[in-house]
């Protein structure tokens, strides 16, 4: 099938599904616009009732219906800054022959992809947990004829978000990959790191989860709530911060050194709980997209097996 015919098939599936999307998505999310990006890639603009606005999503559609879906979250800038899986890695080529839909939301800078308890002057209305676990999957399943089996992956800021969303999403995600993150929230280290990320975007951490270290922060502390990951397929990776052959772009050794220590401790926590996980500790890697691309390639077979890709 030619690329143009594949794109036409995707568009037809979207158009045909619009009448049923309202019933499948919760509550009332829908495709507000679409545009081809070449081959089976498209931009789908999805209206989020929770946030009261349209969210861009870059989508790599599988060649046929019935494929599972990988939700691929980017780092602190949310992808709107031109720094993302789409912009800085080979995702389009890598997934071209894979039986999976890949969805890359654009936005959510410095929000941790969570539901903020109050609107914020810096980040606006952030209800990303609701969007990613309740609104967007129904739209994607209806538009692309997806199987309903999902995995999620995050990197850097969104690594802990991916784990948190897997816990809080119940059966929504069968598998998760957390690459170079730090899944703490409610202890002094977690409070410092989470607050710093929110502040980078001009946000008030109190508008995110209330009083730092309080009840809502504890609800989102992945380390403390790790037991809820039982039964999920889990892939963890991080490096030492020492630049290596895979690194491309600006290396950030201190960030990766911290992520490496956090990830090692979290892998140990899962081991203590008897929860299986694949943990890759790289001797080199400095928090760059070259490293993250390598990690995603290694994570994929584990995610694929869990969702039937």
Regions found by a protein language model. Name each.
Residues 12-20:
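Hydrophobic core
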